[in-house]
From Swiss-Prot:
PANTHER family: HIGH MOBILITY GROUP B PROTEIN 2-RELATED, HIGH MOBILITY GROUP B PROTEIN 4-RELATED. Induction: Up-regulated by cold stress, but down-regulated by drought and salt stress. This is High mobility group B protein 3. The gene is HMGB3. It comes from the Eukaryota. Residues 35-104 bind DNA.
Length: 141
């Protein structure tokens, strides 16, 4: 049985496998000022459904149960019953697109106010300390 590996040898080769980081891990940091994407019609429906479900089932605290019940209810609704939620979602989408245009326009103009933001906090503090003098360094006891 030449070439056969023991269990210990196969385990060690499995452990040596290197995993690649997730695709989005290296992406740029998210801008907190960027408008959030609008809710879909289903999520607009779920906002209302959660309230009514909690009133009918006050003891049920399971998020999964609420989601499952909401999904089943959404599937059972006709297109005419879904229409108000679709209209709300479309309204939010239009508002989002308007906000995104304003956001992108602001990005294209560039950072006018944050000219000094390229410096780190320590650099800014060092500059302030240099202007005040070096009173702290005179302790030669």
């Amino acid at each position: 049985m030449k070439g056969a590996k023991s269990k210990a040898e196969t385990r060690s080769t499995k452990l040596s496998v290197t995993k690649k980081p997730a695709k989005g891990a290296k992406g740029a940091a998210k801008d907190p000022n960027k408008p959030k994407r609008p809710s879909s019609a289903f999520f607009v429906f779920m906002e209302d459904f959660r309230v009514t479900y909690k009133e009918e089932h006050p003891k049920n605290k399971s998020v999964a149960a609420v989601g499952k019940a909401g999904g089943e209810k959404w599937k059972s609704l006709s297109d005419s019953e879904k229409a108000p939620y679709v209209a709300k979602a479309d309204k939010r989408k239009v508002e989002y697109e308007k906000n995104m245009k304003a956001y992108n326009k602001k990005l294209e103009e560039g950072p006018k106010e944050d000219e000094e933001s390229d410096k780190s906090v320590s650099e800014v503090n060092d500059e302030d300390d240099a202007e005040d003098g070096s009173e702290e360094e005179e302790d030669d006891d």
